[in-house]
Design a protein with these regions (language model features):
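Conserved class I S-adenosyl-L-methionine
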Residues: 57-65
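Conserved alpha-helix/loop element of class I SAM-dependent methyltransferases that forms part
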Residues: 35-57
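Generic detector of short, locally flexible boundary/turn motifs and exposed helical patches
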Residues: 23-27, 44-48, 97-101
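N-terminal start-of-chain detector that recognizes signal peptides
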Residues: 30-34, 52-53, 103-106
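Generic structural signal of hydrophobic/aromatic residues within well-ordered alpha-helices
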Residues: 7-10, 41-45, 122
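Class I SAM-dependent methyltransferase SAM/SAH-binding core
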Residues: 68-125
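Short, compositionally biased strand/turn segments
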Residues: 23-40, 111
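N-terminal, positively charged/glycine-rich alpha-helical extensions of SAM-dependent methyltransferases
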Residues: 1-29
Length: 125
């Protein structure tokens, strides 16, 4: 990732997490080796993104997970801005009558934090 004053400032405030504190949504090839995530888009990212030409495009990625697609789009020439929705607006569960929504929320929040850690882990390369 190229040096940038804003990025450098963010990295100063958010040091690289430990790998064991991460949950990788995407697979990556990093200088330190391969990371296997839940989804491996490495061979088919262009197809996954619909074959859209990204050079000199501006992309808003909402919910980048581990950030594989962010990197891919940047490598294709796009200017990518990633936004992570706040955890206060969780819409991933339907609150059925006997569903322990609070327990689910605690587990989900912990897992999402690990995914967010993976974004920082990968982007500190």
């Amino acid at each position: 990732m190229p040096a940038h004053p804003l990025t450098d400032s963010l990295f100063a405030h958010y040091p690289r997490p430990q790998r064991q504190d991460c949950s990788f949504y995407h697979s990556f090839d990093l200088p330190e080796g391969e990371i296997i995530g839940q989804w491996d888009l490495r061979q088919h990212a262009d197809q996954y993104l619909g074959g859209v030409a990204l050079n000199q495009r501006s992309v808003l990625e909402v919910g980048p997970a581990s950030g594989f697609l962010s990197f891919h789009m940047e490598n294709q020439g796009a200017q990518v801005t990633c936004v992570e929705p706040p955890l206060s607006y969780l819409w991933d569960a339907v609150p059925f009558a006997d569903y322990d929504l609070e327990h689910w929320r605690q587990e989900f929040t912990a897992e999402i934090q690990k995914v967010r850690n993976s974004f920082w882990y990968v982007h500190h390369q």
